[in-house]
């Protein structure tokens, strides 16, 4: 046979080989969509220096720490401060040679009085690591926490003005993180026009405020208290000379302080929220409001009125501004703790960011898409004093209990009608996860 001729069998083999190659090429892993890299983490990177932190802890902080094992940042005064740096943990794709990568800044939750940049319970570390493995440069930031408490004896209160001032400080910090990324884009291998935010709860509020609040006058003038230090401009700390606002944001159960600041802003956002959220309300209201008691003391919290995802979505829809939503009917706060919703929420977040990061024009890529889902009632029932729990349905379900630092302290399996004894746990705050059910936070105090 001539060397220039190919048999029918050989031709089929060649075609099959080509088809296999083409199929493999088409299914190749894609940056920003698939896991491509190992991840390198650099802790405590300074993104702003000489920033004033409140430094006079209130006695309630110590009481709660000793009784519940949880640190809540309450302070006696704003007039005592200590200048310290703002820090972030930086996650980068190992061995990546790309010079202009999309970046994501993640802000934890915690009602402005708790939470941390290395908080595994809030998906902060998970999101940073997972996105960096997909080719992003990511950062988990530690914004300033803490609000002043007034009162004496056994009765204390937090004023809505003081809460508003705390939020403003957090907005300053998120803005400083954006400017750090943008100013140091070449050094970090970041595209300054593709810097995005993810925020959880209070972190979502800060992220949305970064998108929509453009100047100091967008915030209420009542925050300027005569007996407290001046807060300064939004961009007073950290890098200067570059824009403070991100190119897109994911708000997990977030809100804004004034619906009018949205204006004609076209920045793409993804809003994720449960309709029965009583912490950051889905529509309009005062988060965390009410009275709390511990060890004979009462703490009354007054917070500013906030406008939740329903209001933001309604305004953006009326203005025909492209954005995305994922609303779950009947779900409460932080429903990504639910086994049922953990992956759907992550998929929504990652797909939204992929569309932004992979487009040439990151300012106009979000497709209007409103999604509603239906949540079911929890089958978990906590017993007296949280010393045990029951499961109302299911068989041989896996459960896990983690402490406030995200460490597993108890695991097992349980079935409907069975009680699980928790008396071996020490005093503290825990998260209970049962397969297929919404996670429950509970505390043990004896």
Residue ranges: model-predicted function:
Residues 306-364:
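C-terminal catalytic histidine-bearing segment of alpha/beta-hydrolase fold enzymes
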Residues 29-99:
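N-terminal cap/lid segment of alpha/beta-hydrolase-fold proteins
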Residues 358-386, 392-394, 445:
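Residue-level detector of functionally pivotal "anchor" positions at catalytic/ligand-binding pockets or at interdomain
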Residues 429-446:
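C-terminal tail/sorting-segment detector
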Residues 96-101, 107-151, 257-259, 278-282:
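Short substrate-entry loop that stabilizes the transition state in hydrolases
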Residues 401-409, 430:
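Short, glycine-anchored, charge-dense loop/turn motifs used at functional sites
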Residues 271-273, 277:
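Short beta-strand/loop motif that positions the catalytic acidic residue
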Residues 168, 172, 176-265:
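Primarily recognizes the serine-hydrolase "nucleophile elbow" in alpha/beta-hydrolase
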